[in-house]
Swiss-Prot record:
Keyword Acetylation in record: no
Pathway(s) this gene product operates in, as recorded in its UniProt entry: Carbohydrate degradation; glycolysis; pyruvate from D-glyceraldehyde 3-phosphate: step 4/5
Active site: N497 (proton acceptor)
Assembly information from the UniProt record: Interacts with ENO1 and AKAP4.
Enzyme class: lyase
GO cellular component, one term: phosphopyruvate hydratase complex
Gene Ontology biological process terms from the UniProt entry: glycolytic process
Designated name of the protein: Enolase 4
Compositionally biased intervals (Pro residues): 189-203
Ranges annotated as biased composition (Basic and acidic residues): 336-346
Family stated for the protein in its record: Belongs to the enolase family.
EC numbers, comma separated: 4.2.1.11
Positions of substrate binding: V300, G548
Amino acid sequence: MEEEGGGRSCGTTRELQKLKQQAMEYYRENDVPRRLEELLNSTFYLQPADVYGHLANCFSKLAKPPTICKIVGKDVLDGLGLPTLQVDIFCTIQNFPKNVCSVVISTHFEVHENALPELAKAEEAERASAVSTAVQWVNSTITHELQGMAPSDQAEVDHLLRIFFASKVQEDKGRKELEKSLEYSTVPTPLPPVPPPPPPPPPTKKKGQKPGRKDTITEKPIAPAEPVEPVLSGSMAIGAVSLAVAKACAMLLNKPLYLNIALLKHNQEQPTTLSMPLLMVSLVSCGKSSSGKLNLMKEVICIPHPELTTKQGVEMLMEMQKHINKIIEMPSPPKAETKKGHDGSKRGQQQITGKMSHLGCLTINCDSIEQPLLLIQEICANLGLELGTNLHLAINCAGHELMDYNKGKYEVIMGTYKNAAEMVDLYVDLINKYPSIIALIDPFRKEDSEQWDSIYHALGSRCYIIAGTASKSISKLLEQGNISIPKSNGLIIKHTNQTTMSDLVEITNLIDSKKHITVFGSTEGESSDDSLVDLAVGLGVRFIKLGGLSRGERVTKYNRLLTIEEELVQNGTLGFKEEHTFFYFNEEAEKAAEALEAAAAREPLVPTFPTQGVEESAETGASSG
């Protein structure tokens, strides 16, 4: 019995020795004894008040870097109560999974206030499907693809996201081709062709035309509307995950997101200063959705002088907004004059009424082009401000919303139609009369390229001609490498759909290289996420366009701007914007620039990010950034 007990004791001792040996090897491999000795020695000399807090901080620096362990997509509501996508990033930090950050991306869908019920219902279903597909992508393939990656490896993350998206594009292409082939197999025998319609009757004599006078002017037919650039359902998952990873990296490094984006922009070299983007604040809206006759001005936008800080600009525009509210609340004075103006409207004073729009500004009823501009002039005079000195104006014309395709003309004011050539004259006259207007956004449809050229050459030396809706998606711009169609000297870019952080860096570099200005814009249906402000600051864009100073989802972003400006002031890294400069190229300069571009195109280019060239083998026609 004693021998048996001694054998068990000997076996236990051998097992303990073996465990001790394994422990020694484990700690030695991880350099624990040396590091622990150094840490304890240094702690003794420092003698911190919180000894365990000090040890915890030191050990955390020795821990493995965080890696992505899970990405979760959720269906949430935006500022208008419509579905959109939220992405949560979970990382393994010191052996435990932790929720690091969340982002909400806005959808690309426009807000149609007066849309037909059937169209609104169809878009609602399309939006719901897009968000549902995005959630599915995030929670299945994307979370597995990025598992174990470091959030700091933004370029590689974006590379994998683009590969994934390219595969989805190919899947969608194959599905559509299959559906097409099935349709062809069931199509009945076509009917004989319908004869062409008879030629239109000669134009009737215009009112006021003298007898015997022949009207020899024949208007050129308008170019048909181009097909809307398709958006692959679910594509917002790519942009949302890319942003979420960038934000997670910033939070893990205890840095603001804008600084992380600035490092991406400057090849990981921290810039000495960062400038705040100039504000483009929507003050009033007089577009198609307003109750007045004026359609031309979807947004009348105020731009504070570049020398003003963001805080000073916001305070000034808040005072202007208060004055507009007072004017709307004032009772209507009795009409003493009933003569008619040039546009057929009564010249007597009309009470201005308004309602809050989804853009965060007041939609007011105006019957002439001058009315909202005179209103702003009056407010500036009351506040001791001078247009063209303290602030400038921009007009979002939303040309694509003004076209009446039955008449082939733009309906500038209800019942007043102008062809594309007449619109050029209208804008030139407007800028001549109101030189404080320094930017026109989407003055035409994108199809009216001839008029874009005309207005650029007529006004480009004193006014920014900016393409927003008229521009192509970021994906297409990067694919083609051409931002000059339509002719403009500025672009509005937005973070939507499959646009990654690497894409934003690349497109802003491209815009900068062409001496164009970049406007970072919000979408029509925004969420309360304020990340796009950090993107604008980090990318160093010229302007930021967030809508008006009302509605929580927009005010949140203005508050973030103020916070960032305060941080930069405290850090001594706030740079300042230069005066407005209009880079205008005449035809000779344009030809010289095109020759240089052609020469540069013959040289092999090294991609800045590995996301470039991923989709060369895939059809990108189903994409939109």
